[in-house]
């Protein structure tokens, strides 16, 4: 009888690249010994579009429609960071009402991003039902976005000195109704998922990152807070009007995939608390700093000509960026989204460096999956939460 000799050589498997609507165009070259992962090499760049170079050849307002293509599931944050930098460089005051509207939109965008992380993450580890539930709630968020901004996804809503338009009549009541409904939905998720023994078996103790490790790798967002560090830029940097609201930083100390899930679920509840307080306390007044329009009036005398008087043009603030450098950041759903900006007395930035949270957080993936099983790769990758638009830029 011929007994087949056991194989001793390793197997190399390509995972991805998938379609951008799925996990994105990330390719993993995985070296396997049976079911055990020996090595994992991520291959990036399939969605690279030169976003930093495009920024250096556009004014800020011209560049705004591009930025929503970085993290296309949390577009409000990319818009916020794009206008926060020039506002700080130009020392531009933002009206209180505009700041409240921005905070509401940012937190709604955080909820939408976390929802679209939760559904596919659970589908990857075998739970199909929540995938349909999260789309039910996400549609309600997108309906609110559509009513306020005119677009469901690529909003192009933030402006230097404020926002593009005021909230429409009846929108605040509609948003408050959503908040009440969504809190019940989150409770339903927790009953369905958090104590599920099959779910716990797949995520508990998988992809553990220690406190020292998470700092050394420069991780941020839920990845950082799930490892026992209470660091949230909304509390640290005091941007927009977050200091005026009562809310708690969500954190866990275990550092595994379950801890990252619990942080994100908790953040959705805290976002609802912030939105409710902002809606109830939103002040009156202008939604945009109109003085911005006069920054560059001398450079465009044709706007004052007789021919242009009867064209309803809304001049955009193409002011000069002063000769300074600045790093500005916001707490995006995936972590610290930052921009290093250098001005040189022109309408275009001299340097526009993006610090994407997904790219930094993805660095630790090869280390996390080593000595794990093949099936754990999707659990760990899902718990990191990446969008290839911002990873590749």
UniProtKB/Swiss-Prot annotation:
The family classification in the record reads:
Belongs to the complex I 49 kDa subunit family.
The protein's location, in the record's own words, is:
Plastid, Chloroplast thylakoid membrane
| Principal localisation | plastid
Which InterPro entries does this chain map to? NADH_Q_OxRdtase_suD (IPR001135), NADH_UbQ_OxRdtase_49kDa_CS (IPR014029), NDH1_su_D/H (IPR022885), NiFe-Hase_large (IPR029014)
Q: Where is the signal peptide?
A: none
Reactions mediated catalytically: a plastoquinone + NADH + (n+1) H(+)(in) = a plastoquinol + NAD(+) + n H(+)(out); a plastoquinone + NADPH + (n+1) H(+)(in) = a plastoquinol + NADP(+) + n H(+)(out)
Q: Which UniProt keywords apply?
A: Chloroplast, Membrane, NAD, NADP, Plastid, Plastoquinone, Quinone, Thylakoid, Translocase, Transport
Q: Which NCBIfam families match?
A: PRK06075.1, PRK07415.1
| Name this polypeptide is given | NAD(P)H-quinone oxidoreductase subunit H, chloroplastic
Question: Which PROSITE patterns does UniProt cross-reference here?
Answer: COMPLEX1_49K
Q: How does it assemble?
A: NDH is composed of at least 16 different subunits, 5 of which are encoded in the nucleus.
Fetch the Pfam families from UniProt.
Answer: Complex1_49kDa (PF00346)
- Alphabetized Gene3D superfamilies for the sequence: Cytochrome-c3 Hydrogenase, chain B (1.10.645.10)
Record gene name? ndhH
Keyword Iron recorded: no
Q: Which GO terms describe its molecular function?
A: NAD binding; oxidoreductase activity, acting on NAD(P)H, quinone or similar compound as acceptor; quinone binding
PANTHER family for this protein? NADH DEHYDROGENASE [UBIQUINONE] IRON-SULFUR PROTEIN 2, MITOCHONDRIAL (PTHR11993:SF10), NADH-UBIQUINONE OXIDOREDUCTASE 49 KDA SUBUNIT (PTHR11993)
Q: Cellular component GO terms, alphabetically?
A: chloroplast thylakoid membrane
Organism (species): Morus indica
The answer to keyword Glycoprotein applying to this record is no
EC number(s) stated in the UniProt entry for this protein: 7.1.1.-
The UniProt function text for this chain reads: NDH shuttles electrons from NAD(P)H:plastoquinone, via FMN and iron-sulfur (Fe-S) centers, to quinones in the photosynthetic chain and possibly in a chloroplast respiratory chain. The immediate electron acceptor for the enzyme in this species is believed to be plastoquinone. Couples the redox reaction to proton translocation, and thus conserves the redox energy in a proton gradient.
Q: How does it sit in the membrane?
A: Peripheral membrane protein
Gene Ontology biological-process annotations: photosynthesis, light reaction
């Amino acid at each position: 009888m011929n007994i087949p000799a056991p194989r001793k050589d390793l197997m190399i498997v390509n995972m991805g690249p998938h379609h951008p609507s799925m996990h994105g165009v990330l390719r993993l070259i995985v070296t396997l010994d049976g079911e055990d992962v020996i090595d994992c090499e991520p291959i990036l760049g399939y969605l690279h579009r030169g976003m930093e170079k495009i920024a250096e050849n556009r004014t800020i307002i011209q560049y705004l429609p591009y930025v929503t293509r970085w993290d296309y599931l949390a577009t409000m944050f990319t818009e916020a960071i794009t206008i926060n930098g020039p506002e700080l460089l130009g020392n531009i005051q933002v009206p209180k009402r505009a700041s409240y509207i921005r905070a509401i939109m940012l937190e709604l965008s955080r909820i939408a991003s976390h929802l679209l992380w939760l559904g596919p993450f659970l589908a990857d580890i075998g739970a199909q039902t929540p995938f349909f539930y999260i789309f039910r709630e996400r549609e309600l968020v997108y309906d609110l976005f559509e009513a306020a901004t005119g677009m469901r996804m690529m909003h192009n809503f933030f402006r230097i000195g404020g926002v593009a338009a005021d909230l429409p009549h009846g929108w605040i009541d509609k948003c408050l109704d959503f908040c009440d409904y969504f809190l019940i939905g989150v409770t339903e998720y927790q009953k369905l998922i958090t104590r599920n023994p099959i779910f716990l078996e797949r995520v508990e103790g998988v992809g553990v990152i220690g406190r020292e490790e998470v700092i050394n790798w420069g991780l941020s967002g839920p990845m950082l807070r799930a490892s026992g560090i209470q660091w949230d830029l909304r509390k640290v940097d005091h941007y927009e009007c977050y200091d005026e609201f009562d809310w708690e930083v969500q954190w866990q100390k275990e550092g595994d995939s379950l801890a990252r899930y619990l942080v994100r679920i908790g953040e959705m509840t805290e976002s609802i608390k912030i939105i409710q307080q902002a809606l109830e306390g939103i002040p009156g007044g202008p939604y945009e700093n109109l003085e911005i329009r006069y920054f560059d009036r001398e450079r465009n005398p044709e706007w004052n000509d007789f021919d242009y008087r009867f064209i309803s043009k809304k001049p955009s603030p193409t002011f000069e960026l002063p000769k300074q450098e600045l790093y500005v950041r916001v707490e995006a759903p995936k972590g610290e989204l930052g921009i290093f900006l250098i001005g040189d007395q022109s309408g275009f930035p001299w340097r526009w460096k993006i610090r994407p949270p997904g790219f930094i957080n993805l660095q630790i993936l090869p280390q996390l999956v080593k000595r794990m099983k093949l099936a754990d790769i999707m659990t760990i990758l899902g718990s990191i939460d990446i969008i290839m638009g911002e990873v590749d830029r």
